[in-house]
Regions:
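Active-site flanking residues adjacent to catalytic metal/cofactor-binding acidic residues
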Residues: 4, 41, 110
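Short, well-structured N-terminal submotif of metal-dependent ribonuclease cores
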Residues: 1-35, 48-60, 103, 116, ...
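Active-site neighborhoods of divalent-metal-dependent phosphate/nucleic-acid chemistry enzymes
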Residues: 55, 67-112, 119
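General small-molecule cofactor/ligand-binding pocket signal
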Residues: 34, 70, 122
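Residue-level signal for well-ordered alpha-helical positions
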Residues: 15-16, 46, 83, 120
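Generic structural signal for small/hydrophobic residues in well-ordered secondary structure
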Residues: 6-7, 43, 73, 100
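A generic structural signal for short hydrophobic patches within well-formed alpha-helices
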Residues: 9, 40, 77, 114-115
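Short hydrophobic/aromatic patches at helix-to-coil boundaries
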Residues: 64-65, 122-127
Length: 127
């Protein structure tokens, strides 16, 4: 199972060529590619603030790409307890990281702060 963080989801929806070759192959082979509703919320906020711009409405793009949505569960939120190194991270990132970890998924991201955590289940989308 692959989970796209907000940066990776935005890249997929706006310009998938930003992904590295390995990531493109990984996404092409994987049958289970998901996103968190937390990312949808974050993209919506950033679009309203003018920090991100999509070519079409977010809901339409999500349907077009046929990605799975992972519901946010209490278990996902509780997983943040077991990731104390994230306490000072962005709360959106913490929830997305915890969601991927609690489900045993690989998280796809280009976010250097997440990659620098050194977890083996976080994959650099630029590779």
């Amino acid at each position: 199972m692959l989970v796209l963080d907000t940066n990776a989801l935005f890249s997929l929806l706006s310009n998938p060529n930003q992904f590295g070759k390995k990531t493109q192959r990984l996404l092409g082979r994987a049958g289970d590619v998901y996103f968190s509703p937390v990312s949808v919320f974050e993209i919506a906020i950033k679009e309203m603030l003018g920090k991100m711009k999509l070519s079409h409405p977010l809901g339409d793009l999500l349907k077009e790409h046929e990605l799975g949505s992972l519901p946010l569960r209490v278990e996902d939120a509780l997983e943040t307890y077991y990731l104390p190194s994230l306490v000072r991270h962005d709360p959106f990132d913490r929830l997305i990281l915890a969601t991927a970890k609690s489900r045993g998924a690989v998280l796809i991201t280009s976010d250097r702060r997440m990659l620098d955590l050194g977890f083996d289940w976080i994959f650099d989308s630029t590779v």
